């Protein structure tokens, strides 16, 4: 197993049944009414930043861009955590957000 492999792909390969159930949960959450898809992705970015998860930030930045979020919206969702999670979380995740936004 390569160390640069996507961690979520590793999870899916090692635990396919559990990953399938997790994907069902994610789909159920995505289908919730009340928030548009872009807002949901921006919230996910903020949550991943609060959790200090650059890999998650990168993934959700790419997903947010695909559904119409601007670079400014993506980076703002990260920086919004400054007073809540601190400078370290923002500095750790901002580069990942920018990198994820550049992905296709």
List each language-model region with its residue ranges.
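Alpha-helix C-capping/helix-to-loop hinge sites
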Residues: 25-32, 46-50, 81-84
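Residues at alpha-helix boundaries and short interhelical turns
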Residues: 33, 50-54, 68, 85-88
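Buried hydrophobic packing segments
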Residues: 46-47, 60, 78, 97
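C-terminal structural segments of small proteins and small subunits
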Residues: 72-100
């Amino acid at each position: 197993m390569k160390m640069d492999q996507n961690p979520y792909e590793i999870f899916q390969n090692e635990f396919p049944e559990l990953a399938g159930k997790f994907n069902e949960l994610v789909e159920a959450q995505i289908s919730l009414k009340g928030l548009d898809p872009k807002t949901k992705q921006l919230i996910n970015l903020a949550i991943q930043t609060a959790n200090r998860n650059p890999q998650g930030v990168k993934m959700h930045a790419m997903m947010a861009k695909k559904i119409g979020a601007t670079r400014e919206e993506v980076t703002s969702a990260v920086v919004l955590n400054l007073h809540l999670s601190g400078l370290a979380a923002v500095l750790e995740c901002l580069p990942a957000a920018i990198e994820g936004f550049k992905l296709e």
